[in-house]
């Protein structure tokens, strides 16, 4: 059984990259939450 998903990096960045998060109000909320928590990476590289 494979655990990891094999999405292409382009798809991954479009779906959950920093710019994708900044586009929506909900996405900005996610970033703010992750900043508040003190995450080293707030969005995927």
Curated annotation (Swiss-Prot):
It holds the Pfam family Ribosomal_L34. One of its GO terms (cellular component) is ribonucleoprotein complex. The keyword Ribonucleoprotein applies. Residues 1-45 are annotated as: Disordered. Keywords: Ribonucleoprotein, Ribosomal protein. InterPro entries: Ribosomal_bL34. Belongs to the bacterial ribosomal protein bL34 family. This is Large ribosomal subunit protein bL34. It comes from Sulfurihydrogenibium sp. (strain YO3AOP1).
């Amino acid at each position: 059984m494979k655990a990891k998903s094999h999405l292409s990096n382009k798809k991954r960045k479009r779906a959950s990259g920093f710019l994708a998060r900044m586009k929506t109000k909900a996405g900005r909320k996610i970033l703010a939450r992750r900043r508040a928590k003190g995450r080293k990476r707030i969005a995927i590289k």
